[in-house]
Amino acid sequence: PIGIDTYKEEIESFLDSLPKMPDAFVCANDHVGCILLQLLEKRGLRIPQDIAVSGFDKNIENPLSESLTTAEVPTMGLGLRLATQILFRIQHPDDPFEVIYLATKVLFCSSTES
């Protein structure tokens, strides 16, 4: 199974399977985006001149994340909204479901700016 410990190997395998590199990658999260940045640079690709990369979630734990374009997710608001919805669902199991949107902010960095 794919997990945090196997991301690098799985991404390398995925890159090897591509007949041609795309112009850009939009990653599911910043952790994957930072791994991808390293692997693409290791292959001699220039970021962003040859290929652009973006992440999602503004993970500040990785030093590479400073160069990664990302979407800043309001995690506190997301957690509070989720908890509220769970409590509501427990109290009202037959009510209709809702679709809820939370605004994100795109933070443009050097991984997409050329």
Regions found by a protein language model. Give the residues of each.
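Flexible loop/turn connectors
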Residues: 8, 12-114
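Short beta-strand elements in bilobed, periplasmic/extracellular small-molecule ligand-binding domains
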Residues: 1-8
